[in-house]
């Protein structure tokens, strides 16, 4: 049998009451595999953001060149989310992402050696960071698939929210871990910010490869809905016996909710990545903060995001799955926090702003993914989540990295959009406001579809 297949075995006839007692222990094995793997992926993703000021100073890269390297990741990551998501649906997604983490770690390790021996070889740096994007692309969709196979619908928001803290934790400590490793083992050289975290990720990938099951039916149990006596979604019933391509055409390509969520995610990511990616550079160039304070901006943003992951999924569960309404509330509050951020001048004000922004923007970032699990069958969750991610990274993330870089870069003349030239950090924040407004409108449509779905299932 294929190493990456789900190996379901005949039902053992274990009473449902016994399965429920054993469920948490077995679920936690699978859960913590995807949790730690995804956390490790952020150690070898956010290290690049933390290294940006050092890459400019030590290697001589420009702001725009850093943007192009980031764009390579965005494009491959975005395309890979859908293409690899289609491939992994119906397979052992838990095992697949452990294997992909190993490949990702090896790639970043090579990137560190390239920086050490060759310096700023732009072509090679773009290829390697783009390859890292391919290997990491399906981490989120695969994790959603594994957790959705185990978690009951009425508790899915909180478990996916708790899982979402994995990249908040990984993202929060990535800069500190990378900088500590560089200072301790590489005499402060920026190459250590790539080599050290990649070794940690490699060890985690190897350690998690054989732990846990991807589906209760691999244990000879009933499906999750039967274990918890929940109604089975119409999509999961109707999709039985359909080919993967038929499922993709009907429940992904032909599903208007998925398309609306895809476009909504673009606007969410313009704000999320725009703040997250450029905060260190913004405070160092515009507010003249020290390098240490610049790196710490990532920490405060990610700690705020940690709060969001724990809070908003649980709140949406309490509202019986009304994910879009909660997401709209978060985006509305962000408009006020962005205003505070633009007027912040001290380290404390900036860090408070970033904490609040993280606590709010990761609400819709999480809930868009949770929302789509209610509109597609389980064996299409990876590709559905991947497709929203593809839109987010190909359009939202790339705009945030290259578009906003062109607007903010003081050595350039700004970016011309519809005859209007956007230039400077003030115009960057105007882009955020437009994205928030459009995102709220689209999520309002999704909220309508969610309400119909909830009432049809009589939750």
Where are these regions (language model features)?
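Residue-level signature of mid-helix packing/kink "hotspots" within the transmembrane helices
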Residues: 46, 74-82, 172, 302-306, ...
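Extracytoplasmic gate region of multi-pass secondary transporters
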Residues: 48-52, 254-309, 396-404
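Cytoplasmic membrane-interface "Motif A"-like loop-to-helix N-cap segments
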Residues: 90-101, 317-331
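C-terminal ends and interior cores of transmembrane alpha-helices
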Residues: 102-119, 332-345
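Hydrophobic core of transmembrane alpha-helices in multi-pass small-molecule transporters
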Residues: 107, 121-138, 349-363, 367
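Cytoplasmic helix-loop-helix junction between adjacent transmembrane helices
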Residues: 128-166
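Helix-loop-helix hairpin linking two adjacent transmembrane segments in secondary transporters
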Residues: 163, 167-216
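C-terminal transmembrane helical hairpin of 12-TM major facilitator-type secondary transporters
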Residues: 322-371
């Amino acid at each position: 049998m294929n190493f990456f297949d789900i190996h379901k075995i005949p039902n053992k006839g274990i009473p449902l009451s016994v399965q429920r007692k054993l469920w948490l222990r077995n679920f936690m094995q699978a859960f913590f595999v995807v949790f730690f793997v995804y956390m490790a992926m952020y150690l070898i993703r956010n290290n690049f953001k933390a290294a940006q000021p050092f890459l400019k100073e030590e290697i001589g890269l420009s702001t725009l060149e850093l943007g192009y390297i980031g764009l390579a990741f965005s494009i491959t990551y975005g395309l890979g989310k859908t293409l690899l998501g289609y491939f992994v649906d119906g397979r052992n997604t838990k095992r697949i992402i452990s294997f992909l983490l190993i490949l990702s770690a090896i790639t970043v390790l090579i990137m560190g050696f390239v920086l050490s021996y060759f310096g700023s070889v732009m072509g090679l740096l773009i290829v390697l960071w783009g390859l890292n994007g391919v290997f990491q692309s399906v981490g989120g969709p695969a994790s959603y698939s594994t957790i959705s196979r185990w978690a009951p619908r009425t508790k899915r928001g909180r478990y996916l929210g708790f899982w979402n803290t994995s990249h908040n934790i990984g993202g929060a400590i990535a800069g500190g871990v990378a900088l500590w490793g560089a200072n301790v083992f590489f005499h402060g050289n920026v190459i250590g910010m790539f080599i050290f975290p990649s070794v940690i990720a490699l060890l985690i990938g190897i350690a998690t490869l054989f732990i846990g099951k991807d589906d209760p039916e691999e244990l000879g149990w009933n499906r999750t809905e039967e274990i918890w006596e929940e109604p089975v979604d119409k999509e999961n019933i109707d999709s039985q016996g359909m080919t993967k391509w038929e499922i993709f055409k009907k429940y992904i390509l032909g599903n208007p909710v998925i398309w609306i969520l895809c476009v909504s995610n673009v606007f969410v990511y313009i704000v999320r990545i725009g703040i997250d990616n450029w905060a260190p550079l913004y405070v160092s160039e515009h507010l003249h903060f020290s390098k240490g304070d610049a790196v710490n901006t990532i920490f405060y943003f990610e700690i705020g995001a940690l709060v969001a992951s724990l809070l908003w999924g649980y709140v949406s569960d309490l509202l019986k799955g009304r994910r879009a309404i909660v997401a709209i509330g978060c985006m509305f509050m962000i408009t006020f926090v962005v205003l505070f951020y633009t007027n912040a001048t001290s380290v404390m004000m900036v860090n408070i702003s970033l904490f609040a922004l993280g606590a709010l923007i990761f609400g819709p970032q999480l809930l868009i993914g949770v929302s789509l699990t209610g509109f597609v069958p389980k064996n299409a969750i990876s590709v559905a989540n991947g497709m929203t991610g593809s839109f987010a990274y190909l359009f939202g993330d790339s705009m945030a990295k290259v578009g906003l870089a062109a607007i903010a870069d003081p050595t350039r003349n700004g970016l011309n959009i519809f005859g209007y030239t956007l230039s400077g950090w003030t115009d960057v924040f105007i882009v955020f406001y437009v994205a928030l407004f459009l995102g709220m409108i689209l999520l309002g449509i999704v909220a309508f579809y969610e309400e119909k779905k909830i009432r049809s299932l009589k939750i």
